[in-house]
């Protein structure tokens, strides 16, 4: 698997960094992060592996 996601949090802001295999995985990771209690904002810096 080429998926590697690093998650950082600070005061309700979640930053997603790393690589995923598809645009769908990128969107899914963002949706999961948004669904976590206390999360106010998600910064999605995930790159899709080509």
Where are these regions (language model features)?
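N-terminal targeting leaders
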Residues: 1-50
């Amino acid at each position: 698997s080429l998926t590697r996601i690093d998650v950082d949090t600070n005061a309700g802001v979640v930053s997603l960094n790393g690589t995923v295999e598809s645009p769908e995985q990128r969107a899914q990771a963002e949706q999961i992060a948004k669904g976590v209690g206390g999360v106010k904002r998600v910064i999605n810096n995930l790159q899709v592996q080509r």
